């Protein structure tokens, strides 16, 4: 019995040692992407005043008064499954399309967004939003994280801040 428990423990440790960075999958071999396999792809979108990240895609949001751009960064195999669109409420929605074979979507999946300061950020279903270089909004800033979605930003300034977190969603920030 001790041998069986020992073998099970060794197997579990060996399996866990395959773990890469949090943005990459476990032992993904040919289906995942390492940073050198990333294929950047520019996306043209309409005007938006909010960002929503869903379905295990990370959004890196860079506030910029000068430029608006959206770029997907993922392996060539994953690119067709990443959805970036502006909905009827003028929200940039970033997520995943459901593939027939879920192993096709393993690996690094990031969307880099440069846009004017946005007043509403929402992360859900393991989608994460990372705000770089601070966020300065003249009016109200709404942050909503749920279903394991996370929002991380530093150096926040706004008139009113409304932050909601539930279902394992996290919101973190400094200098609010």
Segments from the language model and where they lie:
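Positively charged n-region of N-terminal signal peptides that target proteins for export
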Residues: 1-4
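Bacterial N-terminal signal peptides
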Residues: 7-15
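Active-site-proximal flexible loops/turns
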Residues: 9, 62, 154
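Acidic (Asp/Glu) and glycine-rich low-complexity loops/linkers
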Residues: 18-124, 130-144, 157-162
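Short, surface-exposed interaction patches in beta-rich subdomains
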Residues: 153-176
